[in-house]
Amino acid sequence: MSSGKILNMLSPKEAYIQNHLRFNFIIGLFDGGFFGLGIGFASFTAIIPLFVHHLTDSALLIGLVPAIHNMGWQLPQLFTAGWLARARTFKPLTLWMTINERVPFLGLAIIAFFVPLLTKPTILILTFLMLLWQGFGAGFTANPWTNMVTKVIPQEMHGTFFGMQSAAFNGFAGISAITAGLILDKVVSPLNFSLCFLLAFFFLTISYFVLSFTREPVSHSREEEHPLAFWGKSLTLLKADSNFRAFLGVRILSQFAGMAFAFYLIYAVQKFKMSDAAAGIMVAILLIGQVVLSPLMGRWGDRWSHRGVMSIGAIGAALSAVLAWKANSLGWFYPIFILESVAIVAIWTIPIALSVSFAGNENERPIYIGMSNTIPAPAAILAPVLGGWLADTSGFDITFILSAISALFMAAALWLVVKDPAKK
């Protein structure tokens, strides 16, 4: 059957999506690439923790960096779901909200520039205020952005798209991470950090303008719903879907499975005297690993099982933590970061496609996306804080062991409890 006849059989909205699919796919990849180019200069698992490490030796405060980002990303998402369930388009809110996850990097650049003039406690307070702003800005952006993307990309391509976008993100982030390592090594501190954060803001601004070109069809008008009715509907869906509840349990476990990730670099710096330049190379290995694995794991999830791919990532998380626990030289950190890249794809990228697939229709999609991120949010901040506290009081080994055990429980739950949701 010709493509013209197929388009004639589709609804106007479906035909619009098919007509603009290639354009939106490419725009999504460029958006991810430029976003990654920016984040590589200000990584939440390397560059920003290193900046905080220059101000304090507290593993607890260092662990707060990814904790705040994760909590900010996850916590607000359900609170935007009620509005989104009634929205006819998601792009306007996405563009307004995402400003708040980009501008704070300019704030970090200014803060780093004035480090010589301010006390360390003041710098730390200002830094964490910027991280809170950025984290919650990302969280309020996440649900409308995910809904927009999963609306303009057909469901059977969700895993492939998110995998390829993640590859673009991490590929360019790997390039900027190497550059950031050189900047940290060659430019005097704190100007080196200020320059990194300024470059992050510059490329995130380019990403913003690319994102604005997304072509989104207008959905049919939807009835207004009282807020109490929305929360009642959310609770009803949660009670009725035992498989989704099991998935939420896995999402909570995944926060503890990845608890050790924030401390690998700091541990290597403290125990094996890793240089800032070497740290940049390790981050590049981590990101390039995700470049290779993200499209493969995303496509594999579309063809086989997103649940199965997540379980493989859980095993990767466990192995990386065990190797970090047993490492006796810097050479061990090459496989550690490769295994971490497998785990990160499974913990962060694959669940986006999997959580959307639980929804029965487009109206339920914001609710499922919101619940899959907001409900695990307390664990997202508790896990790194617990890991940092354990590292401060009992040593990094305990943090790594607990992370490995959590990852094994996550893998077992995915194989024994969670089932693949039916494709809709």
Per-segment meaning from a language model:
Residues 110-130, 325-337:
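Helix-loop junctions at membrane interfaces in 12-TM secondary transporters
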Residues 90-92, 121-123, 182-202, 389-407:
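A membrane-interface helix-boundary motif in multi-pass transporters
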Residues 215-233, 422-424:
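Flexible cytoplasmic inter-helical loops of multi-pass small-molecule transporters
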Residues 76-89, 184-185, 293-305, 391:
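Helix-to-loop junctions at the C-terminal end of transmembrane segments
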Residues 2-75, 84, 91-94, 98-101, ...:
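Helix-loop boundary and gating motifs at the non-cytosolic
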Residues 92-110, 198-201, 308-323, 401-404:
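Structural signature of the two symmetry-related core transmembrane helices
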Residues 59-60, 91, 155-164, 276, ...:
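Loop-to-transmembrane helix entry/capping segments in MFS-fold secondary transporters
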Residues 140-153, 346-360:
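Intracellular juxtamembrane helix-capping segments at the cytosolic ends
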